[in-house]
Amino acid sequence: MKHKFTKITLLTAVVAGFTAACNPASENIPTGKRYEFNNILDIAYTPDTLTRCRGWFTDAGSWMGFTLPQKDHWVNGFCGPFSLDMNRRQWMAQSAVTVGYADQANVIFTPDSTCYFPGELYLSASSEEGKIIQRLNFLDASTALLRIHSDAGKELSLTASQWGKEIQVQTDQNTVIARHPSGEIVALTFTPDVSVKGTDNNYQAKINGSEHDTYVAISFYTGEKELSAGLQKAQLALSNPQEGLKA
């Protein structure tokens, strides 16, 4: 009951505290009821050691949250996940998935638009190579679905920005597993066509250039038992992502 009360209090404070989150760019944003409410919350925050976060995007009863990156402290991906458990409350990563072009590792992206919609985070950013659009929606309490679209038709490279302290990262085929000593786990599940390799306590995933969207499942678990069952669900969701987004 204490956990439930704390979560309700947190989300109520978020809703009451912020306005004008959306900075729409000129690109078309999909139509639908949720897109009529594009300036409700300001949850722009890039994790650092100097300032505190004031609110997170969470949904479907999840205990993980995300924020939009600040335009003046940009990372090219949604920030988080953050563990909302009252006994831990920690950033598992500054950004578990950042996106760039594989042949331009040091290219600088300029933010075009960041936005919170009810049930969705949205961002787009551009470089000299092209524009990358990302959307994040929760599928259930454990997993959020990241959608990535690039207009350049070039190979993409995905990696994490600054995993949290004490987190150990390993790769297993098309899955990245990041474990914290507390028992909390972040798992990133990629589709079979994505090449994933481990680096120095991190990962790099490469995606062939395509006009189609790329999907990544970002999951949060409190222990190994949840992980083993959850990975199968994440893989199933990636096999038909549009069906999960309808739920």
Place the predicted regions along the sequence by residue.
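Bacterial N-terminal signal peptides that target proteins for export
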Residues: 2-10
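Bacterial N-terminal signal peptides
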Residues: 9-17
